[in-house]
UniProtKB/Swiss-Prot annotation:
SUPFAM superfamilies: beta and beta-prime subunits of DNA dependent RNA-polymerase. This is DNA-directed RNA polymerase II subunit RPB2. It catalyses: RNA(n) + a ribonucleoside 5'-triphosphate = RNA(n+1) + diphosphate. It is found in: Nucleus. Mg(2+) binds at D763. A zinc finger (C4-type) spans 1087-1106.
Amino acid sequence: MESAFTKEHSWSIISSFFEQKGLVRQQLDSFDQFVKTKMQEVINESPVIIVQSAPTAGIETQKRIAVRFGQIYVSKPPVYTESDGRTITVFPNEARIRDLTYASPLFIDVTKETLSELGVVDKHKYSRVPFGSLPVMLRSSYCVLYGLGDKDLIDLGECPYDQGGYFIVNGSEKVIVAQERMASNTVYVFKKAQPATYTHYAEIRSVPEKSSRNPSTLSMKLCRSPGVIRVSLPLVKQDVPLFVLYRALGFLSDKEIIDHILYEDDEEMFELLKESIEEGTVVQDQNVALDYIGKRSAPIGTPQEKRIVMAKDLLAKEVLPHIGTQEFCETKKAYFIGYIVQRLLLVALGRRNPDDRDHYGKKRMDLSGPLLASLFRTLFKKLCVDTTRHMQKCIENGREFNIALGLKASIITQGFRYALATGNWGDQAKAMQTRAGVAQVLNRYNFVSTLSHLRRVNTPIEKEGKLAAPRQLHNTHWGMVCPAETPEGQACGLVKNLSLMAYISVGSSSGPLVEFLEECGVESLEEISTSQLDAATKIFVNGVWVGIHSDPVGLIKSLKLLRRSLEMDKEVSIVRDIREKEIRVQSDAGRPCRPLLVVKDNKLVITAEDIRKLKRGEIKWDNLVTSGFIEFLDVEEEEMSMIAMNTKILADESRNSSDVSVSYTHCEIHPALILGICASTIPFPDHNQSPRNTYQSAMGKQAMGIYATNFLLRMDTLSNILFYPQKPLVTTKSMEYLRFKELPSGQNALVAIACYSGYNQEDSIIMNQSAIDRGLFRSFFYRTYTDQESMSRPGVNEEFCKPSRGAVLRMKNLNYNKLDDDGLISPGTRVTGDDVLIGKITPILDPERSTKEAPVYVYKDSSTAMRRTETGIVDTVIVTNKDGYKFSKVKVRSGRIPQMGDKFASRHAQKGTIGITLRQEDMPFTSEGIVPDIIINPHAIPSRMTIGHLIECLLGKVSAMSGEEGDATPFSGVTVDGISSRLKSYGFQQRGLEVMYNGMTGRKLRAQMFFGPTYYQRLKHMVDDKIHARARGPLQILTRQPVEGRSRDGGLRFGEMERDCIISHGASAFLKERLMDVSDAYSCYVCDFCGLLAMGGSKVNECKGCNNTTNVSMVEIPYAFKLLIQELMGMNIAPRIRFEE
């Protein structure tokens, strides 16, 4: 069978995965789950709103009103209410063009009850009360586009390759980036960095499964001297001794407590507990222990009985709430605290290593579902508070309470919109506490950059932190996170990208799991004696210790069978930790997992026949999972599995006759799947030095190509389109799923590696001007300008028109002649900088001629002009309406021809700018008359070790001759010798060298050139967007120095380092010229006696400080220095300028 299973079979399986799942499934599933279940859960958690009138004299009965919320409904499809009140179905493309929000209205059932002392007097149910609107994720099951075929998508103006997974808010596409966090309900034990009062500490962040309240953190410290264990509880100001906590839970005798911690006679552990036992002897009674906790948590002056009640409540609700928040959970909590103590002591005794914070199994990713749920909870609370306030007012004023008016739907609508539009996740009022950058504008530079953005994972740590550990690549990232794709600089290693087949679990309830475990004979902690614990295996479900079992092997077997037969969710992870005698079952959301082939007796369970069925379309990916051929493992379970890298290893092992045999449980589908989106487009990444792959992953996002097939219909602020994008000659198998061949971003250029003239030194390249003239690497650049008529004051609106110089005030020094009478420019007009594209006038009140009764308005110009540095042709003009006002967008296109200074790069981060363009007749040529398009310098190769670049060139040559794509998928066993022999069979020199002739002289060159087709990308950094110079120009108001930046016509900064260079040259006159004369020279007067600033001029010379009216000198100093002197004077420091005689 193994011999029958080939690499091709692997790719058939992978294709079926992407056919069914796509690349943004994790976003869509998470959003769907939020709408289907999480929203209703938030509503169900909320308490009933009860309001009662204040008691008034003479009236005995108080009026009480209760409002409860019921079922919530999301309408499909998304709609928009026009200014005239009509409701229309809104399609995504219309939302983008008209700057609308693509959102569905929410409705909710509300029950209003009027109560008296006797009970409910009157009950009324209002069904489907408007409840705001929710932005809808594109291609989720609530989107108009869900399930449509390619033809229908094209009719709606959508790109059929677009996979959705983002929102449209105010016309801009927003993606929610996954946020990484530590897993809750897990015990972590760490060593404390010394010096400190304690040596080790254990902590657990506890969150109950269904609620999303803030985590309650319990931490346990092993103190240095004396060696006592103290526990820090939530809301308790001081640490509580361990045994006092146990007595507060109702366990009084030392023996009883120790039985809950140690299950066997362990001398060393008992020694470590001795000090704690002695510290606890002072408190022997439960109430005394509760009062000990109460005193340290209740406000000062609380009576003792109340303190004890408060402490009991705190132990129930705040201590390990994930185990239970009701009464009668004390036994479970006592056992769990004992488990934490045991873990702490094991680490302290050196029998177990401290936990690793960066282990990926201990991380969770919050996708749009959990993030929107926490936002919705905040907004819903706000709405409840607002509704309560409204009801209270109504009752006090004796008005009837109207549900439709009382529910302020705009709270929900505006809250969602604000969070998605700004990326500040949380309440607008508390903007300082919120997380920034959760929602980002979707990167649409090219198709790969879009996909990559939808699979990004962010770690919310301060980017300034110098900690290396969280940024490093961890062993557990294998297959979950791309090892290459991460930004350089500040966010390096903190912003990650998911690997190709990684998926993030959406989570399922633990209820059915616990029921099944009970059926399988798991004994509950309440029913067992402590003596049983020593030999038994502990069973944890989502961090809750549910019981023990005596036959772990059997239990694991039946659990895995259940998962493979799909009676249990396929995302559930089942981990057996043999050394610690634990079985951990996890079903929570946010665990990254990936598919692997199941292996039984060192043979794959899947057969060649199954793959043939898959190819014929008789079965799909889901059938492979349900048949138990493939299963999803998360990091924790993967660590407890034995995974073969490929089927060859399995075959070798099954033939192995030696005594030492390895029993594999799973097999990788293909090792190339450890890479993410961007790294998957690199040919032979396994032959490059690793940082080169990282650089290319960043540059691939800046390459021009076609970002969407509907780019002509879209009105993006900025976009670049390559004229003739080509699919690469040398491809990887993964590109097929990234649609790189359909929407490429580059061209196959003929590249020679040689020193030819000196114009390709230091990473510059020589490009063939004749090839550029034929259209090589030409591109279009589109920019969209937007404007809207709006209300300047009630009843007076702005207006699109062609402003005339006499009638309109404050007209800028621009060209208004190209506008039509309606104030808009017509398509096809050639425009340059300072041409007006949209003419608009704004009415302002004329204070001289207006009276209160008859206001008189004059108009000022507020037109939109082209950017000063750009030229182009008007491509499209649209006029539509938004909120009842005219709204216009103008798209201007300009052609960009490669020229000196433009940046290009191969797919191996070999980037360079054009140093010179030579015409075809000046370029070197081969005996067949073939001329290179690009010549790069040989010095670019050795130090960078991008061998992949050379192999790509070699394989590209073979592809061009054979007419089939070259396969450069990593880890696929392609060898240079194999390619060389094929190249030789086509009659070329086997290592890709060519005899060339000098284009200038026609003589044969002594050296041969390495020459062949290589895929090159044109990057967005173009010299036309950067070229800048200035003589005189605008100044800053405060310092009177030139302003900064090309767009403001700013100066060029002469910085500290430049200053140091000129000082070391000793060129003082030049230094004075740069730093003062041409920057901010200023003449002022200084008193000769006291050296302070004085008044001076033709009429008066006077120093107020020392009443000197005769000796005042004029000095020339930088204005910034004058400013500094005055600021120091304002701080009561007197800087005096002294003159040499």
